[in-house]
Amino acid sequence: MLTLVAGMAVVAGIRQISGLSPQIKWPNDAVIDGKKICGILTEMSTEEDSIRYVVVGIGINVNTESFPPEISDTATSLKLSLGHELKRAPLIGAVLKSFEQYYSRFMEYGDMTCLLYTSDAADD
C-alpha cells in the first residue's frame, strides 16, 4: 500500500508545482500522456510477524532532456512536458507534504478507501 500512497503523493506534488496532470499507472509508475515520468519501488524487512522497516524509493524525471533510444518513446520528464526547467526543491517539498498527509490518513483509517475519493491523484 505504501507504493500507492507514494504514487498519489507524486501525482499531487507534480500537479501542485507544475500544473501538469500525471496519472498513476498501476502499481508503481506515474505517467504523463502515457509516458513514464516516475517510478516507485518499495522494499520491506520483516522479522517474524512484524515489519522492521520499509524503504520507499521515488525517481522522478525532472529536468532530463533526452532518453536512450530504447525508452525515448515511453519516457518523458517534467522539463520536456513543460518546455522549461523545474526547481527540484519545491517539488520534493510538495511530494513529501502530500505523502505525509496521505500516509496519516491511511494509518488513521486502515485502508485506501478514504484516499481514493478525495485525493488529487484520483482520476478526474
Language model features with spans:
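A short, hydrophobic C-terminal helix/tail in secreted or cell-surface proteins
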Residues: D120-D124
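Gly/Ser-rich oxyanion-binding loop with an adjacent helix/lid
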Residues: K25
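Long, positively charged amphipathic alpha-helical accessory segments at protein N-termini or as interdomain linkers
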Residues: L4-P22, I32-S119
